[in-house]
């Protein structure tokens, strides 16, 4: 049987857009997210929203709880077979 390799990755730009949309839906600001996640500065949140980086697994889980969104709703992936 031939093995198929799956090349999967998280799309940081689309993930950031999903986070921003969920924040807007809940009327939460970057400051609200920063405080709720116990971050020392809002820099990480801005980087997520711009698609420069993606949240750690702990932070994306916390965001899903805070934003009442599933991980699937927040994380945007791309798969190349």
Locate predicted features.
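A short, Lys/Arg-rich alpha-helix, primarily the initiator
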Residues: 1-28
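Residues within the alpha-helical elements of helix-turn-helix
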Residues: 25, 36-37, 66
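Short coil turns linking two alpha-helices in DNA-binding domains
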Residues: 29, 40-41, 56, 70
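Recognition helix of helix-turn-helix/homeodomain-like DNA-binding domains
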Residues: 39-54, 77
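DNA major-groove recognition helix of helix-turn-helix/homeodomain DNA-binding modules
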Residues: 58-73
